[in-house]
Amino acid sequence: MQQLQNIIETAFERRAEITPANADTVTREAVNQVIALLDSGALRVAEKIDGQWVTHQWLKKAVLLSFRINDNQVIEGAESRYFDKVPMKFANYDEALFQKEGFRVVPPAAVRQGAFIARNTVLMPSYVNIGAYVDEGTMVDTWATVGSCAQIGKNVHLSGGVGIGGVLEPLQANPTIIEDNCFIGARSEVVEGVIVEEGSVISMGVYIGQSTRIYDRETGEIHYGRVPAGSVVVSGNLPSKDGKYSLYCAVIVKKVDAKTRGKVGINELLRTID
């Protein structure tokens, strides 16, 4: 694996010079191998190690290099034709392979090659970009978008129209991460490498980026870039220091543990916020 990483790192330093016409065989094979490993879930752009999320920047570099070495080509679709550098993940799937991998794909869901989809996942008409990782038992609902290299945990529900941001550029940015057992409400957006920790519930229409204030009304604490585990979050506003105006924020209205969450439905958690 170290040799593969070295090839990617070296090629990335001269990426501006690389084109589909002049890409050398070693680089091309290394990039294709990484994309295949991401596609199968054998590698992932970010993983939790000793309780901390670690981003493997060289894998993101490999994804970026894939755009340098591959030319656009016609991609056949059921209702149209497309022209892109990245093939579709399911282009060569047959019924046996779908049965083996154990997930459902509802038309016209689109998944790019290099994204991993785990067993018992349901993809409604949605979009999953290259480098993303969608873990077991997750529902990606209608018109939801999972951005490049985003990490989605087990038993997550991404409701209709949810946007999970991609972060291939800038390279130092970490991917957006939704941990296990989270619920993201309809039309909410989580972007810019924000981490939504395990068991959190995000209400409909909540927008969270790195600069969004995440206000815990119980403690008065303000978080940035991280929703603490077990949070129930709604959209709100905080007043300016001079009291002349207010600005958008996300508000943690309560905290729930796994036991409470198991007994009480998502709708009940969101309705009883007073």
From Swiss-Prot:
The answer to whether keyword Cytoplasm applies is yes
Question: Which amino acid positions bind substrate, per UniProt?
Answer: 104, 141
Does the keyword Transport feature in the UniProt annotation?
no
Annotated GO molecular function terms are: 2,3,4,5-tetrahydropyridine-2,6-dicarboxylate N-succinyltransferase activity; nucleotidyltransferase activity
Which GO biological process entries does UniProt record here?
diaminopimelate biosynthetic process; lysine biosynthetic process via diaminopimelate
Which family does this protein fall into? Answer: Belongs to the transferase hexapeptide repeat family.
Q: What is this protein called?
A: 2,3,4,5-tetrahydropyridine-2,6-dicarboxylate N-succinyltransferase
Q: Which organism is it from?
A: Escherichia coli O6:H1 (strain CFT073 / ATCC 700928 / UPEC)
